[in-house]
From Swiss-Prot:
Gene3D superfamilies in the cross-refs: 3.30.1320.10
The protein, known as: Small ribosomal subunit protein bS16
GO cellular component: cytoplasm; small ribosomal subunit
Keyword Chloroplast: no
Organism: Paraburkholderia xenovorans (strain LB400)
Family, as annotated: Belongs to the bacterial ribosomal protein bS16 family.
One Gene Ontology term of the molecular function aspect: structural constituent of ribosome
One GO term (biological process): translation
Amino acid sequence: MVIIRLARGGSKKRPFYNIVATDSRNRRDGRFIERVGFYNPVATKGESLRIAQDRLTYWQGVGAQLSPTVERLVKEAAKAQPAA
């Protein structure tokens, strides 16, 4: 099963997460199919969250499940974008 989840990067005490589509049996930071965004929880001035919405929609369309944390981040990103 394909799952969209966070893969941790960064250094000690300075986490950085890639939002990736991966097989659920792979390790957290292991092999992934596609990187669809990033989340930087310690960003001060720069962009802290970016999600390629078109790719996220594609993966959900082919049956990928979102992890609970990624689901929360997607909702947060939707609120942050101005209504068009």
